[in-house]
Amino acid sequence: MGVSKLDILYRRLLLTKLFIRGWGRPEDLKRLFEFRKMIGNRERCQNLVSSDYPVHIDKVEEQSDCKILDGHFVSPMAHYVPGIMPIESVVARFQFIVPKEWNSRYRPVCIHLAGTGDHHYWRRRTLMARPMIKEARMASLLLENPYYGCRKPKDQVRSSLKNVSDLFVMGGALILESAALLHWLEREGYGPLGMTGISMGGHMASLAVSNWPKPMPLIPCLSWSTASGVFTTGVLSKSINWRELEKQYYTQTVYEEEIIHMLEYCGTDSFKMGHEFMNHLPSNADKLTNLNLVSRTLNLDMTDQVVSPKDAKCHKSGKTSISAPSNGQLLQDTAKMECLNQTLSTNKSWFASYNPQSFHLLNREQRRSNRQKESLIFMKGVMDECTHVANFSVPVDPSLIIVVQAKEDAYIPRTGVRSLQEIWPGCEIRYLEGGHISAYLFKQGLFRQAIYDAFERFLHKYAN
């Protein structure tokens, strides 16, 4: 399956640059990785937010068909990883849109998490919440992401997260904040409760539901099993400040000497480093700024089947082109990542054993190429560590999960990563024609229908 030309064009038109200041403080990454181990286990995480966690309503607005409540609470993340959130993000804010009449004795509520660039509430309110009031008498709770809207740091430009670590802070905060809101909704007598989101919002909703100790409808739209592909093989990879990431990786040895060793195995596409990896990369993979970055850099043969790491053996592709793909074809069609994922699992300490003397014998272009490749591997590793759903608990009832995906999504590559159906046996995946942008613009009705279907499935299985 090809990738959407509209996705590629839209990305080129945007000015936003990501991670302009680099990886983030090494101390912060260490704390986040340790915290990820805690929230990756439902038995441990479910007790982090108490069932009576305080939530405050600031304003109630009466409208003809609904009530709109604005509220706030202190993010639990500020208690467990103090000082890691920007001061502007510590107070979580939300908007709750409630119908004046319900269709039955149930009072269903769906929490919507924001996608990339979705500041404040108006998009989700207009495109999802208000139609859901009209179509199904279903309430919606819109949580504002850390780093977005009123929670955006003063020195942040638009949606440009300054550090890679900011994304992990956002994810950890949303998991705990979602738990606080779910507890509050239960206390207020609402139910059934579910979660959804589009793009990044769908992925964050997946992580949040994985830590909820009860069956819950989950409808992730335009998201997949990990964010590593988004930032290494998707069109967003072009918006990343790779030069700063490379520079920091090579000037601060803490990344390869300490942080690498904190990354955990999460399945066949894990980060464990192998000696064979560099041998499979073409020597002229020299421009991370090119849109076809990974079709050159990750030029490896790959199949969709899952291979056990013990039995995994790399095999070279016949004649894989490394020329620029025509008509915007990139990444999924030419980048073959299974061999990468297998070789990465063989030896975690490859960087530690790298011979610096031989490195200095390389010419400048070769050194630059190696820096690019190793920074890319490290990005994949840290993204898988904190965002791969296989590093989190399986939701209590995967049959209540309906995943909506675009067949030609250039933002959320599915090639080379584990399928959600493998990680969450029993979930349903619905595929839409087209790419990420066209689905977001024109398929909102199908997203809402998936929400209604998942809630109906819940009532059929669990209604009293």
UniProtKB/Swiss-Prot annotation:
RNA-binding listed as a keyword: no
GO cellular component: extracellular region
Glycosylated residues (UniProt): 341
Keyword vocabulary terms for this entry: Glycoprotein, Secreted, Signal
Compartment annotation: Secreted
InterPro entries the UniProt entry points to: AB_hydrolase_fold, ABHD18
Signal sequence region: 1-24
SUPFAM superfamilies per UniProt: alpha/beta-Hydrolases
PANTHER family: PROTEIN ABHD18 (PTHR13617:SF14)
Similarity annotation: Belongs to the AB hydrolase superfamily.
Name recorded for this polypeptide: Protein ABHD18
Source organism per UniProt: Mus musculus (Mouse)
Underlying gene: Abhd18
